[in-house]
Amino acid sequence: MTADLFDPLDTTELAVEPLADGAMVLRGFARSMQDELLADVHAVIGAAPLRHLITPGGLRMSVAMTNCGALGWVSDRRGYRYVRVDPERGAPWPSMPASFTRLAALAASSAGFEGFGPDACLINRYEPGAKLSLHQDRDEHDYGAPIVSVSLGLPAVFLFGGSMRADKAQRTRLQHGDVVVWGGPSRLRFHGVLPLAEGEHALLGAQRINLTFRRAARALL
């Protein structure tokens, strides 16, 4: 069976690559939904344009970001947090597309996390040279829900570390359509992305799009 024909509803032939207890890569899981996903990505970006956020320390992030769902993750001089209203537009974030919620729930279930219902999706655009430093996802209220991360476009090297920043990180090459899920004992592991290498993807050109689904309920300001 080819990746293009793979139906994520049928997990009998799913290629699963374990990373740690409660963490794994679902190889090619999203590829059969790529057309719908990319159309919805473009619609969200059209409504809430990508932007380069500033860290609390005043540094400009190399990755461009936007959000959809009830909550959106933002960063500025005030810190990291989830908000209901896009601070640049003064309006709620776009609704999360049905294709997003379906994929996130299916991927989480395939990784052993039943009943996952994300209320936040962070859309990251990586262009060559963009990276994401090692960090933990700690701004959510309930660490019992997993993280679901979908890769589209150019390949990237994903870093998956331990419970401390100094722990040695595994390096895993992620391809178009791969989905990483981590939760349970791995929920607070450090993770990041090495600088994106130059390249050209048939559908997305010289970029990588990452969709990160979280349950962030009550982590509001």
What name fits each language-model region?
Residues 1-221:
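Non-heme Fe(II) oxygenase metal-center motifs and adjacent flexible, charged/small-residue loops
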